[in-house]
């Protein structure tokens, strides 16, 4: 199994992302339920335009974040650190992402919030189930690497 496939399988089983945005010298983090898109290597989420993180993001912004489980033992720790770009989706792109998102999280039908995409450009996946401190690295613009 290649690196991106391994990372993607794990991301598809999780559902909460934490991401941080920087704007005019200020940092802010947020959490949201997400849907992983393996084809585009992206996370889709809903957040209102009035939130602090959405206002700081504007139409598009650089982000960094994490996705992690909550294991009770060190040997089972798994988690992703990433950097990428967040943008608010519009039109058909938004409609398609919302439809997929609502299949995973039907309760979100009551939320009128816009759909946002976090395009993952760099991923570091720590997977202690493969050995303590084992890391898998993936970069959008180059071949996947293992470290």
From Swiss-Prot:
For this protein, the record's InterPro entries field holds:
Split_barrel_FMN-bd (IPR012349), UPF0306 (IPR011194)
As for family, the record states:
Belongs to the UPF0306 family.
What is the protein named? UPF0306 protein YhbP
Give the originating organism: Salmonella paratyphi A (strain ATCC 9150 / SARB42)
Q: What gene, per UniProt, encodes this protein?
A: yhbP
